[in-house]
Amino acid sequence: EMTQTLQGYMEQGTVKIGDKDDVADAGFVMLGNIDEAKMDEYQNMFEDLPSLFRTSALMDRIHGFIKGWDIPRMNEGLKISGWALNSEYFSSIMHLLRDDITYRAIVDRMVEYPANADTRDTEAIKRITTAYLKLLFPHVRSMQDIKPSEFNAYCLTPARKMRQIIVRQMGMIDLQYKGKNVPTFLIRDYE
């Protein structure tokens, strides 16, 4: 029952508890530790997780995977002193940007992909690309506000890589996905 609830939420943003349906518009991030020996996207990184997370049906609903081992471990040199951005202020801005559909519209206009591309792969890549656009280029209000090369390097390519890790992991537990790649996205010519 928990599996179906989680899959439903991840797919449609709805949760059914008893006879009551609730709609949510929040996403969520799952955090976890992977044994250091398995920190390799070309190995099955999910095998030690609970069985709920080792099904391709649930994994396919995960948009992307951030390789935490590429993020530097916190150390004294990373701490700041003096002026800083207040995290509550930053969180408020991110919350406001969540409702701004301009960024997704820009992504939809900028990218093209094969007509037969997998819907979940396409949606995951577009959502992650939109998130990168909001985070890294919050000033962008139209396609002309960002260079295609920057959009590709900092938004689209990282999003495709994050989704490809999920697809690769699914291929290790379900033959249906073995050797599958995410769709090729191209940036429309608009300059």
Regions found by a protein language model. Give the residues of each.
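Conserved AAA+ ATPase small/helical "lid" subdomain
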Residues: 27, 63-152
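Conserved Walker
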Residues: 11-26, 47-53
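Conserved AAA+/SF3 P-loop NTPase catalytic/coupling segment centered on the Walker-B
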Residues: 1-9, 33-43, 57-58
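Hydrophobic/aromatic-lined pockets within catalytic cores
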Residues: 7-15, 70, 137
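Short, flexible/disordered intra-domain loops and linkers
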Residues: 1, 39-48, 75-82
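C-terminal engagement/docking regions of AAA+ P-loop ATPases
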Residues: 146-191
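Structural recognition of the conserved hydrophobic beta-strand(s) that form the central parallel beta-sheet
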Residues: 21-42, 64-67
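A short helix-turn-beta junction within AAA+ P-loop NTPase domains corresponding to the substrate/partner-engaging
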Residues: 41-73
